[in-house]
Amino acid sequence: MKTYSQKASEIQREWLVVDAQNQVLGRLATQIATLIRGKHKPTYTPSMDGGDFVIVVNAEKIRVTGDKANQKIYYRHSNFPGGLKRTAYKVMMQTHPERIIYFAVKGMLPRNRLSRHIIKKLKVYAGESHPHASQSPKVYAVKG
């Protein structure tokens, strides 16, 4: 029996909608990372981008456990001396709630060239509406 390798012409992608309302951030992010990588499919090939497009709505209503709402800090650096910037979770939730899910999922992807293509299939929106209705996305029931 030979090992199956998926070809680029065999890739079939779906559009899925995930509702983030009252979901725990890390548990939701792991499921989204699995979907956009394509690991839930029997035709998964590590060297191919065979995952689905995922639309996340209600990102402003995501939950974190424990005291992370007060303690969690996001870091970025401008590559200039003294250029470390810190943003608290509460501030990020007020200004850019969609970035919280984006950074959580991006941190769960491998650090390689393929991950830059994979993360582009994640679309996160703070409210309930999204501009991807023409793709006729299916509702994905979050496990757990």
From Swiss-Prot:
Q: Which residues form a coiled coil?
A: none
Which domain of life does this protein belong to?
A: Bacteria
Pfam families the UniProt entry points to = Ribosomal_L13 (PF00572)
Asked whether the keyword Ribonucleoprotein is assigned, the reply is yes
Q: Does the keyword Ribosomal protein apply?
A: yes
Record-level GO cellular component terms: cytosolic large ribosomal subunit
Q: Which GO terms describe its biological process?
A: negative regulation of translation; translation
Which UniProt keywords are given for this protein, alphabetically ordered?
A: Ribonucleoprotein, Ribosomal protein
The cross-references to InterPro entries, in alphabetical order and at most eight, read: Ribosomal_uL13, Ribosomal_uL13_bac-type, Ribosomal_uL13_CS, Ribosomal_uL13_sf
Functionally, this protein is described as follows: This protein is one of the early assembly proteins of the 50S ribosomal subunit, although it is not seen to bind rRNA by itself. It is important during the early stages of 50S assembly.
User: Could you give the subunit structure recorded for this chain?
Assistant: Part of the 50S ribosomal subunit.
Designated name of the protein? Large ribosomal subunit protein uL13
User: Which organism does this record belong to?
Assistant: Herpetosiphon aurantiacus (strain ATCC 23779 / DSM 785 / 114-95)
